A protein has these predicted regions:
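N-terminal [4Fe-4S]-dependent radical SAM core
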Residues: 2-24, 34, 239-309
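Flexible, glycine-rich loop/tail regions that form catalytic "lids" or insertion modules at the edges
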Residues: 459, 463, 501-503, 508-595, ...
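Conserved small/polar residues in nucleotide/adenosyl-binding loops
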Residues: 654-661
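Conserved SAM/AdoMet-binding glycine-rich loop
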Residues: 29, 45, 59, 65-68, ...
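Glycine-rich beta-alpha loop elements in corrinoid/cobalamin-binding modules
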Residues: 42, 61-260, 267-268, 272
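Flexible glycine/acidic-rich beta-alpha junction loops that bind and position SAM and/or redox cofactors
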Residues: 90-99, 147-149, 179-184, 209-213, ...
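N-terminal pre-triad scaffold of radical SAM enzymes
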Residues: 30-35, 296-324, 342, 357
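Conserved alpha-helical substructure of the radical SAM core
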Residues: 329-354
Length: 665
């Protein structure tokens, strides 16, 4: 049993600092999340990393931004800087739905309580700190600032906004995964440099006059259209984004410079991908893997979801158009060593309430562990946003052998009854036929072992749509591959006597998607016996190609016009097709099908049965009715008692996938 003392956690109060014998702190970190001392929570990662390098660091979780600002004053003035992060998710995604309605809960807050963070904490916290301590540097990190490092469209305010440094008053952004740039900034300031002079650290963003940019603006820099020009011309914003995304995905990027408010936002290129040893060091820090004792007796939903999970790698080369993982973690997959993974699994086994079931052995995508470019030189020249779309790159090693070895080693540990894969699986990697037969055999073995040993009753996959035209805009594989994978899934279930479900995720109102596409999606998924549950409206979030397409009306790569559903009526007209099986939706769906000239789909959806105001539930359909779902759960051969079918709260699944495994300042 783990018996942790208060001093085993990073301090959050003056008293806790005194218990450690600390006077002035070096860095004070303000976070929009509750403090959970776990490698899936960015404040803990950065805090532990600084602690390991000899710095005195404290965390102020979810400070009260009202009244006299006592939470911002209580730890005094740090020696080096204040660090500000909104938390593991974009604060606006966390607080609002795709329809801009306020959510009623917050998964990163004790007991899911709503209202413990403001809109845009990066801005609110920074302004307060600058008001109270104008001469102390304020450093922004985390997903919110990272994805707002240049001119970006803000869906919640429905306007184009400047680099977040302009509005927040902060001094610098440490974008992406924050271990290296944060530590380097500490060393530079400790050596006596002023924050205004620190302009050479990779993976940082700062504001400067033209004459103050180191080396001046050179031919190797990419000078983007200014913020003011983007306000006048949406096509300029679309053109900008192609450069921004390409430089985010390159091994050796160029410096980006954008004019704004008579100065320039300068984005220094990122560090090279971390090594396995560097990633191990981040995960091997002395985390307690528990919420701070101040939350005793309370439940933090996000922690409950991942407390028995282990992250295997960072980065994702999928390049999905609506996802921010590659923009924040990078395109190149960096894997932990087997030894580091096994150490963490043993820590989980030692947890007092662990019952033998690992809820996830995964990452941003479950089955990219160990995959890399066969020829590293080709990767160094590559600027593709995806290694697997529109086709899988011939240079990509898609061998699942290393991942299988991890699974086997984990499952062989005493105390492990089952390890489940809760992260999304890329079935296009499983179906890929490479020239290496060993790799093909490993993919077949992985597929069978995944289904027979690692599915907690339901396997999550993300086809996202059925229209190949829409899927091309999403950078997702053809829906025909989902058919192929489902046939394999069903066959293995029959052979093994299992009764598992495959749960597909879909998005409506994505740029380029029309009502007719959604109507055909309804027919195709009906024919596959699905009554869809895991669905959502597309939510534009900063720094995705889908968002730029949605806002500008142009594909950033081709500059061809792309239409999008934007008004509530247009979005509802698409979303209703997910729920064709609900009696209250039928009349509206039939009206819409007649309006768009597709009355032929009415008989396909409803089998020619006249509408009598009552739903027809197919007993074979997944999610057909609550009674059917309960019955299946009782019959499951591989039932996971930790499984939470609805995720946590009402946070949209796309953004959970984007952020739930990120570790950042």
């Amino acid at each position: 049993m783990c018996n942790y003392q208060l001093t085993d956690f990073l301090p959050t109060t003056k008293k806790e600092c005194e218990l450690r014998g600390w006077g002035q702190l070096d860095v004070i970190l303000f976070s929009g999340d509750a403090y959970v001392d776990h490698p899936s929570f960015g404040a803990a990662v950065i805090g532990r990393m600084l602690e390991a390098n000899g710095y005195r660091v404290a965390i102020v979780p979810q400070p009260d931004w009202h009244g006299d600002y006592r939470d911002f004053k209580k730890l005094g003035r740090p020696r080096l800087f204040f660090a500000v992060s909104p938390g593991a998710m974009d604060s606006m995604v966390n607080r609002y739905t795709a329809n801009r309605r306020m959510r009623h809960d917050d998964a990163y807050t004790p007991d899911g309580r709503h209202g413990m963070r403001p809109d845009y904490p990066s801005i609110v916290y920074s302004k307060i700190l600058k008001q109270l301590f104008p001469d102390v540097p304020v450093v922004l990190g985390g997903i919110e600032a990272s994805l707002r490092r240049l001119t970006h469209y803000d869906y919640w305010e429905d306007k184009l906004k400047k680099c977040i440094l302009c509005e927040s008053g902060a001094d610098i952004i440490l974008y992406g995964m924050g271990e290296k740039n944060t530590l380097q900034l500490c060393r530079e300031l400790e050596n006596g440099r002023s924050i205004k002079d620190v302009k050479d650290i990779p993976q940082t963003v700062y504001l400067a006059k033209k004459e103050d940019i180191p080396g001046g603006i050179t031919d190797t820099d990419i000078v983007l259209h200014s913020h003011e020009e983007c306000l006048r011309n949406k096509k300029a914003q679309a053109e900008n984004f192609r450069h921004i995304e390409e430089e985010s995905n390159k091994m050796h990027a160029q410096r980006l410079i954008q004019g704004v408010d008579h100065q320039f936002a300068v984005v220094n290129p990122p560090y090279p991908p971390m090594t396995t040893e560097e990633l191990d060091a981040a995960f091997d820090l002395p985390y307690t893997r528990m919420p701070h004792p101040k939350y005793k007796g309370k439940t933090i939903p996000a922690y409950e979801m991942i407390k028995f999970s282990v992250n295997l790698h960072r980065g994702c080369f999928g390049g999905c158009a609506f996802c921010t993982i590659s923009a924040h973690q990078g395109k190149f997959v960096v894997c932990r060593s087997k030894e580091s993974i096994m150490r963490e699994v043993k820590q989980v086994i030692a947890m007092p309430d662990f019952k033998g079931y690992l809820s996830d052995l995964g990452g941003p995508s479950a089955n990219m562990y160990g995959m890399h470019g066969r020829n590293p030189k080709a990767c160094e020249r590559c600027r593709r946003p995806s290694c697997i779309n529109p086709q899988i790159c011939p240079n990509l090693v898609t061998d699942h052998s290393k991942l299988l070895d991890i699974y086997h080693a984990v499952d062989a540990l005493p105390g492990i009854k089952k390890s489940f894969i809760g992260s999304g699986v890329r079935y296009d990697l499983l179906l890929h036929k490479s020239k290496d037969e060993k790799s093909n055999e490993a993919a077949r073995q992985y597929t069978r072992e995944l289904i027979t040993r690692h599915v907690s009753g339901r396997l999550k996959v993300a086809p996202e749509h059925t229209s190949d035209r829409v899927l091309r805009l999403m950078r997702k594989p053809s829906f025909s591959q989902f058919y192929d994978f489902k046939r394999i899934f069903d066959r293995i279930n029959r052979e093994e006597g299992l009764n598992q479900q495959i749960i597909p995720y879909f998005i409506s109102s994505h740029p380029g998607c029309k009502e007719e596409d959604m109507a055909e999606l309804a027919v195709l998924t009906k024919n596959l016996d699905f009554h869809l549950e895991q669905v959502q409206d597309f939510t534009p979030t900063p720094m995705t190609v889908s968002t730029e397409t949605w806002y500008t009306g142009y594909d950033p790569y081709t500059l061809e016009p792309v239409s999008s559903a934007k008004t509530p009526r247009e979005k509802l007209a698409q979303r209703q097709f997910f729920f064709w099986y609900k009696p209250e939706e039928r009349a509206s769906i039939e009206r819409e099908l007649r309006r768009i000239g597709r009355p032929d789909l009415i008989s396909k959806l409803y089998d020619g049965v006249h509408y009598h105001g009552r739903a027809h539930y197919d007993p074979k359909a997944i999610g057909s009715s609550p009674e059917r779902t309960d019955m299946r759960e009782k019959k499951r051969k591989s039932f996971n008692p930790n499984f939470q079918p609805r995720g946590f709260g009402t946070v949209s699944y796309t953004h959970l996938r984007a952020h739930e495994t990120t570790l950042h300042l």
